[in-house]
């Protein structure tokens, strides 16, 4: 079974400000092709975090890329927040896409395998696991809890044979 990749906001920001070879070039065509085939998604809440108007418009013009939030994700989100209360930082005053990102992966796995873990979902994030002194979990920590693979953008490109170094 081919993986289904879910992109985090920090990957979108990386594509905007990262290596100039990736900006507005063939990498976006590849992302679009992967989205058309159902292999790459950006959860709706995560896309809502993206602030660059021009790039955000590019994503919004491709509805096949956006993974709409639904009742199944809400159920996964409730489970996630209940099982991992340290994944929610109560001091944040804006909606955070981290929890919906992981709950979307849980939903895809549940639909594919009947369990939250060991399914086709792969979270793509540049976030690092939390440091011991930090009180809240990060995306990779929550993915670890549910045995959801969490990789960075370059690892995804390598897995798909796009990047060969």
Predicted regions and their residues:
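Short His-Asn-centered micro-motif
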Residues: 7-9, 43-45, 97, 124-129
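Conserved beta-strand scaffold positions in the cores of enzyme catalytic domains, especially
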Residues: 40, 66-68, 150
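PIN-domain endoribonuclease scaffold, especially VapC-family toxins
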Residues: 44-95, 162
């Amino acid at each position: 079974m081919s993986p289904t990749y879910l992109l985090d906001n920090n990957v979108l920001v990386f594509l905007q400000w990262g290596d100039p070879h990736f900006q507005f070039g063939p990498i976006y065509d590849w992302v679009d092709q992967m989205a058309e085939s159902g292999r790459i998604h950006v959860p709706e809440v995560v896309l809502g975090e993206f602030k660059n108007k021009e790039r955000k418009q590019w994503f919004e013009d491709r509805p096949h890329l956006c993974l709409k939030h639904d009742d199944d994700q809400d159920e996964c989100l409730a489970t996630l927040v209940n099982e991992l209360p340290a994944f929610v930082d109560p001091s944040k005053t804006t909606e955070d896409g981290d929890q919906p990102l992981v709950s979307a992966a849980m939903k895809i796995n549940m639909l594919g395998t009947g369990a939250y873990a060991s399914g086709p979902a792969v979270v793509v994030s540049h976030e690092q696991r939390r440091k011991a002194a930090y009180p809240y979990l990060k995306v990779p920590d929550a993915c670890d809890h549910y045995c959801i693979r969490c990789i960075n953008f370059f690892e995804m490109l390598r897995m798909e044979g796009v990047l060969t170094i």
